[in-house]
Amino acid sequence: NLLTVEGLFAGYDGQPVLRDLTFDVPKGALIALIGPNGHGKTTLMRCIAGLLKPTTGKVEFSGKKVTGLPAEEMVSRGVVLIPQGDMLFPDMSVVDNLRMGAFLPAARAKFSENVEEIYGMLPRLKERSSQMARTLSGGERRMLAIGRGLLSGGAILLLDEPSLGLAPIVIH
């Protein structure tokens, strides 16, 4: 399995959000977490990405225990989180924002080739490549955040509210 979560408990300020969560994600799988607001989807992704330390339980990634490792260590292992908010660099161009996604050496070496692939999937980004990120529409900013995440070359991509602000044609 690429990811194993076992007996995970997590929450905020003593308030539990996740209770005894257990599941596996095989390599190559596409998994969707569906549920009402406030039921732990973001909390789970934050635990996996190293942004929130679980109260108890275990997270394994590529067969290695990674529970509680810091976010920078998780990124270096190939775990990429695209949060609900844009988290873009507003005063940088679209292409420079995309370049920031390819900060690991292996991704950086293939940036020119991979950015063309992103432009093929999200052609609006190519049209706007020299524009500052702050000038983009909400949907374009979401496309940019997703494109930047894809350029990281991570082994697993965690998208929080992936279709938020996107036009239906882009989602399909």
Language model region names:
Residues 132-136, 140:
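Conserved ABC ATPase signature
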Residues 13, 31, 69, 94-113, ...:
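ABC-type ATPase nucleotide-binding domains, specifically the catalytic core motifs of the NBD
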Residues 49:
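Helix-to-loop junction immediately C-terminal to a conserved catalytic motif
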Residues 150-155, 161:
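A short, proline-enriched helix->beta-strand linker immediately N-terminal to the Walker B motif
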Residues 57-65, 77, 110-115:
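Conserved ABC transporter NBD signature motif
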Residues 34-36:
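The feature captures the beta-strand-to-loop junction immediately N-terminal to the Walker
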Residues 91-99, 129, 159, 169:
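Short coil-to-helix segment of the ABC ATPase nucleotide-binding domain corresponding to the Q-loop/switch region
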